[in-house]
């Protein structure tokens, strides 16, 4: 130990050297007044090396830990020609067991390369979901494959409710026994209907029913008289209209192109009444009707 009661004086240089040699701990504290920081742990570079080493070990560990199952014949594997792999049963079942599914990062990196080890002949036909249809979704979500099957079922139901697509191709209408009607009978029936519609209370019609639908409506109106004594309508042909009858009686030549029309009266009575009726119709056309007070001579 160093004692302060030495006889050496502090003023000499030699005495200072002797004192420093006797007390080495005192020199560390007085070495420029700096304190050395103690070491607290590994540095950043060492920590980075340790992290990279652990990551490299974790990537190589699944290939050594998980051994492939034995190739013993299980009841789920069916007899097939060629090599049979144990994964084919899981593909057909639609799900993998939990021990065969690798961790998430490894599965994301290696799922493309792992497909090359499986033969294409043992793979079943993939549906619309592709490879990911065999992975079970979480409990809070539903698989997209279920949505596809529901959509197909709804299409079948809707197509069953709409049978007209198939009726156009397969259904044939049943044709019953048809009756043929001669053309002459149709014409006489249409004449009867026209006469019934156009016969007035006085027994006269407005104009010739044969020329009702004809486009040449410029000809003057003619009269047809109904004979109530006859049970069935008997048509008599008249040679000319009112103007041609007047021309014949006056001695002038009438044209040869005759337009026939029909009447219910015999020929003798028809000629007598045509003379009186032709003048009366001309005058009535321009007279006023006293019942309604309408002047027919006014033209719009």
Swiss-Prot record:
GO biological process entries: leaf development; negative regulation of DNA-templated transcription
Bias (Polar residues) occurs at 1-10
Q: Which InterPro entries match?
A: SPEAR
Q: Does the keyword Repressor apply?
A: yes
Listed A to Z, the keywords are: Repressor, Transcription, Transcription regulation
Where does the secretion signal sit in this chain?
A: none
Q: Where is this motif: EAR?
A: 294-300
Annotated region (Disordered) at: 1-45
Composition skew (Basic residues), residue ranges: 25-39
For this chain the motif SPL maps to 40-48
State the protein's purpose. Adapter-like transcriptional repressor recruiting TPL/TPR coepressors to inhibit TCP transcription factors. May be involved in leaf development.
> What does the further note read?
Knock down expression of SPEAR2/TIE4 and SPEAR4/TIE3 by RNAi in a SPEAR3/TIE1 null mutant produces lines displaying epinastic leaves.
> Tell me, how does this one assemble?
Interacts with SPL and SPEAR2.
Q: What is this protein called?
A: Protein SPEAR4
Source organism per entry reads: Arabidopsis thaliana
What lineage does UniProt assign to this protein's organism? Eukaryota, Viridiplantae, Streptophyta, Embryophyta, Tracheophyta
């Amino acid at each position: 130990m160093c004692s302060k009661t030495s006889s050496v004086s502090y003023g000499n240089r030699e005495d200072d050297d002797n004192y420093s040699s006797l007390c080495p701990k005192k020199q560390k504290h007085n070495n420029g007044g700096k304190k050395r920081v103690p070491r607290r742990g590994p540095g950043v570079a060492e920590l980075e090396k340790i992290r990279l080493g652990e990551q490299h070990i974790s990537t190589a560990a699944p290939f050594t830990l998980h051994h492939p199952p034995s190739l013993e014949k299980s009841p789920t594997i069916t007899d097939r020609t060629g090599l049979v792999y144990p994964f084919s049963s899981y593909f057909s079942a639609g799900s993998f067991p939990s021990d065969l599914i690798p961790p998430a990062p490894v599965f994301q990196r290696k799922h493309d390369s792992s497909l090359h080890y499986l033969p294409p002949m043992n793979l079943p036909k993939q549906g619309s979901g592709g490879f990911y249809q065999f992975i079970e979704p979480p409990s809070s979500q539903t698989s997209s494959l279920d949505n596809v099957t529901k959509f197909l079922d709804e299409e079948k139901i809707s197509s069953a409710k709409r049978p007209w697509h198939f009726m156009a191709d397969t259904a044939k209408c049943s044709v019953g026994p048809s009756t043929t009607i001669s053309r002459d009978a149709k014409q006489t029936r249409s004449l009867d209907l026209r006469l019934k519609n156009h016969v007035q209370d006085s027994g006269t019609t407005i104009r010739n029913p044969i020329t009702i639908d004809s486009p040449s409506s410029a000809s003057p109106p003619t009269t047809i008289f109904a004979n109530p004594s006859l049970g069935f309508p008997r048509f008599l042909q008249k040679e000319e209209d009112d103007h041609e009858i007047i021309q014949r009686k006056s001695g002038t030549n009438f044209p040869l192109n005759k337009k026939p029309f029909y009447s219910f009266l015999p020929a003798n009575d028809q000629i007598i009444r045509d003379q009186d009726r032709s003048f009366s119709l001309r005058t009535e056309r321009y007279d006023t009707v006293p019942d309604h007070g309408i002047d027919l001579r006014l033209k719009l």
